[in-house]
Amino acid sequence: MPVSALAFEPLVDVQARNMGEAQADVAIRGGIFETTGFRAGAVALYDPQTGHYSAEIPAAPAMLSAPTVLTGADNALGGWNANAGTIAYEWRRVRTGGMASAGAGDNRLWRAEAYQGWVSPVGAGGRRLAADVAGAWSDSDGSRTFGESRFRRYNARLQLAGDGGQTDLFYGWQSKFISWPNLYTPYNVIESDDLRTELLVLNHREELGGGDFVAAGAYWRRNVDHYVYNRTGATPGPSNHTTWVRGAGAEGRLTTGTFAWNFSANFIADKLESDTLTWGRFNTRNHTRASLAPETSWALAGARKLTVLAGAVFDDTNRDASAVSPVARLALANAAPGALADELYVSYAASSQVATYTALNSRPSAGLFRGDPDLGREKARNTELGLKGARGNWAWTAAVFHRSERGLVDWIYSTSLPNARVASAVDIDTTGIELVARYTGRRLDLVLGYTGLRKDADYGNASADASFYALNFPEHRLTAAVTVRAGRGWEIRLDNEARRQKPNALRVTGDDAVLSAVEVSYTPPRWSALRLTAAVDNLWDSDFQDVPAVPAARRQWVAGATLAW
C-alpha cells in the first residue's frame, strides 16, 4: 500500500495496529491521525467517517510518485482539512513494462502483486496514449491469535501524456479484513474491521515552464465498513457504515510580471449512512476551500535572493462557521560558495478543519464511543523557522516549529468512565525540532532523522486520565535508513527507529523502543530481471505499543521473488 513506504520516513510517524498495511494512523509533527491529510494530484482524498480510513488509498504504489510531506505554509496552501500536515502524491508517468512478485512467510503469510503498463507511439500533438493495470493480494493469520488479515486490490488507469502535460483517469477497488486484540478499544477483546474502498479519479496537470503550472481534478470515493467490537461475544452487535465523497479541486502557480500567484480551490460533498452513528445533527456536508497567495522576489548582493509570500485561505461548510486564515513566508536564498544553507526561511500559517462523523454522531451518553454533536471548527496557528541545504552527496533540512491548536478533537479515557472512549476538544500547544540529512552515493544511501516534541494540553472540564492520540507522541525519535549496494547483485536495507514516547496510562509496555527491519536482496548478474528477497520486520521482537493498549505485532519474516520485464 502507499502507506508502506512511510513506515520509517523521518517526517512521518506511522502508528500501526498489526502491520501498517493492516491499519495505520499517520501523524505529522506530533499531530494525530485526523490532522493528517492526503492528496493525489489536484484532489484532496478524505474519509468523512473517521481519519483512521484516510490512508485507505486503493492505488498501486507503482502508479504514484514518491510522497511529499507538506507542513507549515505549504500545508496551509496545499492541504485540506489537515492542521498538522499533508501527504501529497502525483500520478506517475506510465512506461511500457511490468513486474510480478510473490512471497511467503511465517504465520501463514503469502503475498502477490502484478503490474503492467503499455505506452503507444507518439500521436497528434506529441502526446502518447498509455494504460496500466495492477493487482495485489495478501493473506496472513497474524503474529497474534485472532490477528488475521486479508487484502485484495485491483487498479486500472488510462493516461494521455506529452512534454507539457498529463491527464490520468484512474479506478481502484480494494477489500481488507483485519482482526486484532484491542484494535480500537482498550477492553481486552478481539475486534475486527471489514472494509471495501472504491476510488475513481480524473486528474490533469499542465507544466507551463519556470515553475508555473495548473492542475485540476475530480473524484468519487466510497468506503463500506463493517466493524465488530467483540468477535467472540454476542454484544454489542456489529456496526455498519458507508460513506460517499464527491470532490473537485484545482491548484496552480502563474507568473505575471514580478509576481507569482499561488492558488487553489476545493469543493467536497460527503454523505454517511450508518446504523450506529445516528446521534448527530446531520449526515451530509459540503466543504468549500479557496486560497490565494502572491509572492515576489528581490535580488540582493552576494548571490542572495529574498522571496516574500503572503495570502489567505477561506474555509467553509454548510454546517459550520467559516474561517479566514492568513499565510506568510519569508525566504532568503543564498547561492554564494560556503554559505551555511541554500535557503533560510520563516513562516506563519493559520489553518482550520472540522471533525468527522464518528466524533460528531456517536451517542453522547452511552456506548463504547461517546461523541459530541456540538464539536466546532478546529483551528491551528503554525510558526516555523528553518533551513535547507545541499553539498556534494549530502542534502539536509532543519526546522524549529510551534503549533497552537484550539478545539482539537481527541479521544480520551477516564477512570470515572472506564468502558468508553470520549471525543473531547482540547487546546494544545506543540513545540518541536525536526532534522533530516540524506546521503546518496554509488554504494551507500543514508537517511537520518531526529524529531523532538513537547506538548502542553488543556482539556478544560473533561476528565482525561489518558489520551489515545493527542498525547501519544515521541518526545524524542531517531530514524536511520541505510541501503548498502554490496556488489555482485547483493543489496542490504536496514531501517531503524529509536524513540522515547510520552508516558501514557493506557500503554502497558515500556515507553522506550528500538525498532528495526532488514531486507537482503540478490539480483543474479546474468539475469537482472529477477530479484530475490528475504526480509524481517520487528527484528528485535519489540512489544512497544504504537497506539496505547494495542498489542504490537511480533517479529515476522517473509521471502519472495520479483520478476520485471
Predicted region positions:
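Extracytoplasmic beta-strand/coil segments of soluble accessory domains associated
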Residues: S4-D47
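Short acidic/polar hinge/loop motifs at secondary-structure boundaries
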Residues: V43-T71, G85, Y89-W91
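Short strand-turn segments of transmembrane beta-barrel domains in outer membranes
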Residues: T68-D74, G85-S120, G135, D139-E148, ...
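Surface-exposed extracellular loop regions of Gram-negative outer-membrane beta-barrel proteins
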Residues: Y115-S140, Q174, A218-V228, A260-A269, ...
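Flexible loop and strand-edge segments within Gram-negative outer membrane beta-barrel domains
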Residues: S140-F151, G165-G247, L277-T278, F282-N283
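Outer-membrane beta-barrel signature, preferentially recognizing the C-terminal barrel domain
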Residues: Y184-G210, H241-T243, E343-R406, S414-T440, ...
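Gram-negative outer-membrane beta-barrel transporters
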Residues: S297-V308, A395, F401-S404, A423-A505
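C-terminal beta-signal and adjacent terminal beta-strands/loops
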Residues: Q501, V520-W565
